[in-house]
Each structure stands twice: as C-alpha cells, then as structure tokens.
Amino acid sequence: MSNFGASDLEAVLEVADVPPVINQIQFSPFEFRRTLLQACERRGVALEAYSPLGTGRHLRDRQVARIAERLGRTPAQVLIRWSLQRDVVVLPKSTHRERIEQNAHVFDFALTHEDMAALDGLDRTGGTDHALERPWW
C-alpha cells in the first residue's frame, strides 16, 4: 500500500483476503505520523518511510545538524537512524555514490533517548495522518 492513513488501513484489513504487509508513506521527524505508526504496529503492517530526508530540506535543520555534529555523523544519517530506531523501513533517495555509501553506514551507532525526543519535537503533523485521509473514496 502507499499513502494509506490509519482509517484506510483498517478498512482494507476488514475486507482483504490477503492483508497488506507494508504501507509506504512520507515519514520523518518532520512528518512523524504517530497514530499511523501505532496502527501499523498493532496490525503487523510494516511502515516504509518514503523521502525520509525531505528532498534535502530537513538536512539543513539546526536541531538535526547539532545532533549530527555531536555524533560525528551526517544529518542524513541521523534522520535515517531515527526511522530505523522506530522499526520503520527507510528508502532514502540519492544519485550520488558518496551519499548512498554514507546513508548505508547507520548501523554502528544509536541515537540517545534525548536525541529521539528532540527529533520527535520537529513533527509538523501533530502526530496525525490527516493529510493521508481520502474523503473522496
């Protein structure tokens, strides 16, 4: 599935002979859709973060940069690691070999509870998935 909100997910699960295994949405600390993440966790549906780097705009955030500098990591690595620590599948996009290699080096460090909380605070959705709801269906 792609861009299904929590209510859409429930509607599909009510009628599906074969339940979905993954839901791909835009997901990052800036689009931290807690309600949908929790719904997917409860129902055994993996969440896949599309555009976890926000087409680059999130890489310039001051909070992300401070954490990255303290850890000796890139802002992209910090954002990818945040999703991984939430058990979210991450699909960062890059066409540059160096960045692709950097993006893969995120399994040898962890963000602290304080780092995770600071990044959670960047959310602009209020934790909801209203932007994903489809009232016209």
Give residue spans per PLM region.
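Beta/alpha (TIM)-barrel catalytic core signal, keyed to glycine-rich beta->alpha loops juxtaposed to Asp/Glu
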Residues: M1-W137
